Structure formats: structure tokens, C-alpha cells
A protein has these predicted regions:
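Glycine-rich, aromatic-flanked loop segments that form ligand/cofactor-binding clefts
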Residues: 144-156
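Conserved, mostly hydrophobic/aromatic
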Residues: 40, 61, 83, 115, ...
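A charged N-terminal "starter" segment
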Residues: 1-145, 187, 191, 225, ...
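Active-site loop/helix belt of alpha/beta enzymes
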Residues: 2-3, 153-297, 388-390
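Short, glycine-/Ser/Thr-/acidic-enriched flexible segments
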Residues: 39, 63, 86, 107, ...
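Structured core elements
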Residues: 78-80, 101, 124, 148-150, ...
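Charged (often Lys/Glu-rich) extended helix/loop segments that serve as interaction or gating elements
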Residues: 259, 273-406
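Short acidic, glycine/serine/threonine-rich loops at helix termini
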Residues: 69, 92, 112-117, 134-137, ...
Length: 406
């Protein structure tokens, strides 16, 4: 994994932003997550360098840790939030309200009131009833919020596990009905100011992403003409993927930027004041995180080797429930050749608790420290943190040779 070597390996040793493994596993109890601030900044700058005309909104759902949010806020990112608690986290981390977009398919009156009181850049509507609720709340608060209409487009579906367009969906207005449906509620306080389209997650296909960006640009202009709303913001969603298996290639961000340069330039020439947004979570933070757990016992059973660790699906559930094989390393033995095929398991009393099946590792022994890579997104908060009362893993952030609890 190229990013792992780039961000975490120095002279054959596991090091996060200058802090060696011994300084982590010796000082803090395993299991824990460690995040590299340098890695987060690097991924943000890469995206911003190739798409300078876009505001990059960090999707807090990927990792709402305040320290992670702070790194991205100070780097210049905005925020995309999906709950009142995420909104509060973003504001506490220092994100300006004008840099925040609120995206959630089930909004209550209390949710909408909190969002409108905060004065975010935009709130996304998924249905005509959403528009009615936003309008009623705006009237009661005497505010004039900016609304983005989310659209379930008719575009071709990409090859991805989580696809949110092209078929029936709980998300957004169906493209073929959006003009009629959005015209239903009479809006006197809220105003439709643009569109949002989030098509899929974890997309590595550059050609499809280029087609998606062009599709959304055309659709935004078409709807603006047909409905008469002033196009102030176009939110393209996210979906930028990362390598999740050893065989995966990285997303060619430079090639993607080159592929959409002409349609973007034409759009900007027509609408130079229109704000363009990308939402990005996994792409920015996943590769910046490693889940660290310690081997308690090694067992061989009927031809299989099991490394039974102090952290499993209770602390890192994603590999189990999403069936994703996060690359594994013995962090204290990076310079040794892999000679064994190992099932890395946790302490939970279920056979489901295997966080890395058939991992190719040096033959493990008790006391070894296992790292699961690309664990910076959908790790801690997606896990079964109170299952079997095992205790919660720590979160640590390393930044320029300083390690602290995040």
C-alpha cells in the first residue's frame, strides 16, 4: 500500500508523524486508532491542488473526531454534516457556518431549526415535504436560508458498493419529477439556490467520475433555466475512492481534473459566481488512520493460524460488516518476510469477530502489534463500542513529532 509506506514507514519501522510505535504502544493501551495529521493535510492539498475552483467540504460522518476536524478546518476545508450533533462538532472545531452544508434524508422540525439558527451555507432538501418544513421553519425564525435540491439522477450507475442514483432511492427528488415536485411548496422565505447530487461511495473509476461531473453541470444549468431559480451553488457530492485492497490502483485525481477541465471552464465562464462543492470524507482521512491492536494469543486449529487480539469488531467493526479486507501488518516486525496466512481475530465471543481473514504476515506471536491500514474513516464511530462491555479504543493523533489523545 503506497500511502502506508509514504505516511507511516521510516527505515523499516512504523512511525506516525515522527512518533515511533514504541512511543505509542508503550504509553497507551491497545487497541487504539492513530491518525497522521500530515497524511490528512497531504490528501486535502492533493484534492485542492487539482480542483482549485472547488470548496472541499469534509464529510464528518467519515470521522467526526474533533482533532481530525481541526486539521481539516485549519487546512481550509468546509464541512458537510448529517446530524445536529455533527453540526455542533463542526462549529466547535472552528468551521465557519458559511462553510457548512447540511445533508440528511430524515430531518425533523428540531433539526431544521438548529440548522437554520446556525446560519449554514445551505441545507439540502430530499423531497417536497422537506421544502415545506424548511419554509415553515424559516418563516418562524424570520430567516432566508439557501436550499439545495438533491437529485436522484438518471445517470448510469458506477461499479460501487453503495450507489444512490439511477434507481428507487430514499435520497433526493427523482430527476424526471424534480421540476414539478420542487414547484409544489410555495417558498417565500427559503429559496432554492442550487442542486446536490451524491451518486456513490468509494468510486475509483476516473472516467465515470468525469462523466458524473459533466452530467451534474448540465443538469444544474438545465434546471435553473426550467425553474427560474438563480444558480448559486452546485454540490457534486463525493465518492472519491481509495485503494482498499493490495491490488487496487489509486484514483487518478490529476487525470480526472484534466478530463473535466473544459466543461468546468465553460461553466465558470457562464456562471463565475456559482460556488462549486465537493464533499469528501473517506478520501481525505481513511489512509491517514491505522487501527492498532495487540496479539494476546496465537492458536493453530485444523490447519489455520489465529492471532487472537485485544481489539476486534467491538473496536473496528467495518471489516466484519462491510466485508472489506483491510491490509494488515505486524507493526513491530515490518522488516520481516510474510510466511504465514493468519486470521486476525478479536476478543468477542462470536465467530464473526475476525477483522482480517487470511492476512499474509510473519508468523505471529503473543505481544506482537497488528496494524490494520486505511482505518481513518468509518472506524471508531461505526463500531460496536459497547458490545460485551470491552471498553472503548483510544483515538490518538500524531502531528510533527507530537502524539496526543484526539
Amino acid at each position: 500500500m503506497k500511502r502506508f509506506e509514504e505516511f507511516f514507514v521510516r527505515d523499516g519501522r512504523f512511525v506516525a508523524d515522527g512518533v515511533p510505535l514504541e512511543g505509542m504502544a508503550g504509553k497507551y493501551e491497545t487497541p487504539f486508532y492513530v491518525y497522521s495529521a500530515t497524511a490528512i493535510r497531504t490528501k486535502y492539498r492533493l484534492l485542492k491542488e487539482h480542483f482549485p475552483a472547488f470548496d472541499i467540504c469534509y464529510s464528518l460522518k467519515a470521522n467526526p473526531n474533533p482533532a481530525v476536524c481541526g486539521v481539516l478546518m485549519r487546512s481550509g476545508a468546509g464541512a458537510e454534516v448529517s446530524s445536529p450533533a455533527e453540526l455542533a462538532t463542526a462549529l466547535a472545531a472552528g468551521f465557519a457556518p458559511e462553510s457548512i452544508v447540511y445533508v440528511a434524508p430524515a430531518k425533523t422540525a428540531a433539526d431544521v431549526e438548529q440548522v437554520l439558527r446556525a446560519g449554514v451555507h445551505a441545507i439540502v432538501a430530499d423531497a417536497a415535504s422537506d421544502l415545506g418544513l424548511i419554509e415553515a421553519t424559516a418563516r418562524s425564525l424570520a430567516v432566508k436560508p439557501r436550499v439545495l435540491v438533491r437529485i436522484n439522477t438518471k445517470e448510469t450507475q458506477p461499479e460501487a458498493k453503495e450507489v444512490m442514483v439511477g434507481g428507487p432511492s430514499k435520497f433526493g427528488f427523482d430527476e424526471e419529477r424534480v421540476v414539478a415536485d420542487a414547484a409544489g411548496p410555495k417558498l417565500e422565505h427559503a429559496r432554492i439556490a442550487g442542486i446536490q447530487v451524491y451518486s456513490a461511495s468509494q468510486v475509483l473509476n476516473r472516467a465515470w467520475l468525469a462523466e458524473h461531473i459533466e452530467y451534474v453541470l448540465r443538469l444544474a444549468q438545465q434546471l435553473s433555466r426550467e425553474t427560474g431559480f438563480r444558480l448559486e451553488t452546485v454540490d457534486f457530492g463525493g465518492g472519491f475512492g481509495i485503494p482498499q485492497h493490495e491490488r487496487d490502483a489509486e484514483l487518478d485525481v490529476a487525470g480526472l481534473a484534466e478530463a473535466v477541465a473544459r466543461p468546468l471552464a465553460e461553466f465558470r465562464a457562464d456562471l463565475p459566481e456559482c460556488r462549486l462543492l465537493f464533499e469528501s470524507g473517506r478520501y481525505l482521512v481513511a489512509e491517514a488512520g491505522v487501527f492498532v491492536t495487540r496479539v494476546v494469543r496465537v492458536k493453530e486449529s485444523r490447519g489455520r493460524v489465529f492471532a487472537i487480539c485485544d481489539g476486534g469488531m467491538n473496536a473496528f467493526a467495518r471489516p466484519v460488516f462491510m466485508r472489506i479486507k483491510h491490509p494488515a501488518r505486524l507493526l513491530n516486525r515490518l522488516d520481516e518476510h510474510a510466511t504465514a496466512h493468519v486470521d486476525v481475530c478479536g476478543p468477542i465471543c462470536t465467530p464473526l469477530d475476525c477483522i482480517a481473514r487470511d492476512a499474509h504476515l510473519p508468523m505471529p506471536k503473543a505481544g506482537d502489534v497488528v496494524g490494520l491500514l486505511s482505518a481513518g474513516a468509518y472506524g471508531y464511530t461505526m463500531s460496536l463500542l459497547d458490545f460485551m462491555s470491552r471498553g472503548r479504543p483510544l483515538e490518538l493523533i500524531a502531528d510533527t513529532e507530537e502524539l496526543r489523545r484526539a
